[in-house]
Amino acid sequence: MKCGTRSLAVLGALALSAMGLVPAAWAADAGQSGAVEASQSGAAQTEGTQAQSGAAQPEEPTQPAHSSAPETSAQSGEASPGLVDTPIPDIQAVGAGDDSAMVGATVTTLGVVTAAYPAAESGLGATLDGYTIQTPGSGGAWDEGRASSDALFVYAGKNGQVPAIGTCVRVTGTVGEFPATTAKENPQSLTQLAATSVSNVEGCQAVTPTPVTGVPTPDQAEPYESMLLAPQGTWTITDNYQTNQYGTLALTPGESPLRAATDVVAPGAAARDYEAANAARVIALDDGTNTNLLNGAATEAAYAYLANGSPARVGYHVSFAGPVVLEPRHGSFVFQPTSMVAGHPDRSPVTITGQRPSAPAVGGDTRVATFNVLNYFSDLGVDEAGCKGYPDRTGAFVTAKKCKVRGAFSREAFANQEAKIVSAINALGADVVALEEIENPVAVGVGMDRDASLARLVEALNKAAGSGTWAYVPSPQIVPEAEDVIRVAFIYKSATVAPVGESLIDDDPAFTGLARQPLAQEFARVTAERSAPASFVVIANHFKSKGSVPEGAGEGNVDNGDGQGNANAIRVAQAQALASFAARFSDKPTLLVGDFNSYSQEDPIKALETAGWAHVSGAGEASYVYSGRSGSLDHVFANAAAKPLLAGVTSWAVNAQESIAFEYSRAGMNAHLAIEADNPYRSSDHNPELIGLTLSGGGEPAPTPSTNPSTDPSEAPSPAPASSQAPSPAPQRGLSQGTTASTRTTPSRQTRTPSNLARTGTDADRAVGLGVLLAAAGGGLLLVARRVRRRG
């Protein structure tokens, strides 16, 4: 529903009230306008990164075939329901597992239709093809002593007639479970009646929805299976990853989304207990269909809970304006609307409210940011021979798929990606930005200019902000011989700060072939006299992801279920190597920033704290959302010299809380949703961190800044000799050179030509050990099981 409009959902609430299916107060409340907002995007996801669209997701199994559609008769002249063969609670009485004890039996029963899902409504193929009935006069207050449900799903088949909500019907059919059984499996199944005949009945008592204030446990949910519920109070969106693909929102009661366990508590038993509690407090709000909304005719249907101007962001609040049905789908109980909302957002049973945040203020006179820009590749898949991509609904490739390049496939996709990133960076208000996931064309094998993509980004930033506003720190003369296809980098505003000397790369073996090498750069504030009272060092980082275990990795790298995922020992070694590298700058204010692929209480973060680094990132903020859990993989650390200069540290929730539907990679996936390339929201999958420094209050004079910042791709020093093992450069003012592993000389750039637009990709294997953690914790009721997230 949209702000200030009286939708058909209002009329539906009034009608349901008249039939006795909703509290009268709901009908009154439904007429009150409210601010409503909702949001989305679609491929596979891993911890710390989102995947490309078009990845296949498991569909709900096909319903059992029947020889004929149920016979429907309209014998509406009966004065009273009369006797029935089998009451619904008897059909729902459990036998083995959660299965009905009457599976396979043919029965006749009576009920009031509380939810209706006609076959192929709105042209969507995978609909529920049936309706829900509930014992006349049942419902009302929650009953902890309830032994069996008073409601039942009736499968009508693809050609069967579905009675209207409020109709009282007598149904004959065969009792079954869908999927087939839970007797030997953990996931719940739906008890259903495959109808063979249906007749209308008059004189039935109305059904009353049962109020609920939280998520029922599995034991509580089974005796309320398929019954009409009235969720009360405020709920919060904790996950929207599937909203544009399967139409679901993951909700939790209260006013805050769920947190990632190891962002709050220590790994191990505490994290397992925390995640078990999380799992017990989340339930999906479905859209009344099983359709994959990224496929076929479904791409023409409007999303249930997501629209331009109404982004259903993680953290937005939800209130229920109408009843829902509690039923198991895909192994978990969900709140199912009483009719299909996919294609009919006006039928939504909920009101969603919230507001997108503007860039925050942090104070100080100099601001530093760190931003993972989701595989910004200026080399494109379309220009790589044999490269394929993930298609939009027209079949046009949007993002590269298993190519040398990552990121955007087409020029249009790259333009969308770049526009959002430029909008976000220019809105940050930062003077220095450490970037992660910038293309390294040399490592990709598509060029000799290591800075080509970085220069392209600065060119785009200056086109939007004004010529000369931004410059980039060029690669140092000596760079590692073995690098990743993505790298870290620095850009800065040349009117306020300038680099001091050459940057320095930490080529420790802990990073080689496993992650991106850290990059250090000293900066000085520029004043009218071209000097500043203090300089500072920033070290950009991008540690190994959680998603995979490299071949030959040692002990401590396989996910052991403690909540830290894969490659934890590798990340600890990287943290220790970083601490050793950064120790050389102990006499200067120094910040460690970037994507550490570790939550706040995990071992790599503790290793840096043990080494004396203050973890100054904002407590309780979240730079990333994975599987409905919010936490920070991106961090800021300060040494003793930097702490007194801190004016503030915060995160801008511009990306992670947004639906992936607004990401450039999901452009053209739905006829009713634009990705909004003109704004910064969902410019990446990570939120940027922003740090305020106060440098004007004193301190020793800073070293003289470098005088020739790289502000344009055409400006570069003269070419250097093309030697693979260049001698070390002469000492300069700025960062002192450290011992590196195998290195090579960076080709200098006298004439830089813009690179042909090209690729995008991110840490291909980033994923969290949440599934293992859940298993170790004994699972939970309502973790939606439809999703398999990978990074391709």
Predicted regions span which residues?
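C-terminal segment of classical bacterial N-terminal signal peptides
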Residues: 18-26
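C-terminal low-complexity, Ser/Thr- and acidic/Pro-rich disordered "stalk" regions positioned immediately N-terminal
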Residues: 697-762
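Divalent cation-coordinating acidic motifs and surrounding scaffolds
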Residues: 161, 248-249, 292-295, 337-701, ...
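Small-residue hotspots
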Residues: 19, 111, 173, 324, ...
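Extended non-catalytic accessory segments flanking core domains
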Residues: 77-399, 417-418, 509-511, 517, ...
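C-terminal membrane-anchoring or membrane-association module
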Residues: 24, 756, 769-792
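Boundary at the C-terminal end of the N-terminal hydrophobic targeting segment
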Residues: 25-30, 35
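Sec-dependent N-terminal signal peptides
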Residues: 3-15, 770-771
